[in-house]
Amino acid sequence: MNLYYYFELIADERRIRGLFLAKSASASEWKAVSAAIKTLVEEATFDATNEGLTFRAMDPSHVALVDLLWPSVAFESYQCEKPFKFSVRVEDFIKLVGRSDAKDSVEISSTEEDAISVKFTNGYKREFVIHLIETSAGSAPLPKLEFDTKAILTKTIFERVLNDISAVSDQVTLAAQNGTLAFSGKSDMGKAAVALDKTGAELLDLEVKAESKATYNVDYLTSIVRAAGQAADTLTCEFSSKKPVKLEFRLNKQGCRLGFFLAPRVSSE
């Protein structure tokens, strides 16, 4: 038996014994996902099946929810012959993912129940092992909602609008009617208002089934847009009057999707 054949047998044996393996061409999706999760929770439990990777959790105050769907076909390489859950401290996971360079491929795998391996490769190969944690947190149910308004806009303009509104208020009111998507905020200091329509380059599409108006916390929205926006240039915003808002980010062209739900603020008017 030559050495090459021997090493191939070892590699095949490891692949067979492996509980889970997911390889992506870059770390941008992992950075966006982990940063988005960090805005809501300190611990995260990922569910891996042969269909892909999912994560869903609600913040402690139960006003916001993040929902990740990362199908197996969206990875460069993916293996999961039986369901596998792994729980990590989000801050620790971010530290490791943050060690990657822009052109690194990322491989996350596990051959044992209590740890995962994180590998970065781009000529310079690095491997980190992070021990898994035990957590009692379960997966949050996904809200079943139908929305009256759906807008597709650039991440840049949405973040800019939120920053403008936050200059005078910690709440932003979204209103849609007659082909216009409006944002406003007010406080004892004063008022701020921004209006977008499809004549501009920033609002890519707007569908309004019925006039919609609802108010949300600016900080929650800003945090998730900054986090997920690391890997997404555009976002979909859906809402209805006095109902939660849903933001959806497509993190790659193969179907990796990050959703975010935020409950409305109760108006004092």
Which positions does each model-derived feature cover?
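DNA polymerase sliding clamps and clamp-related checkpoint/processivity subunits
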Residues: 2-38, 43-167, 175-269
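Polyanion-binding surfaces on beta-sheet-dominated domains and ring/shell assemblies
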Residues: 172
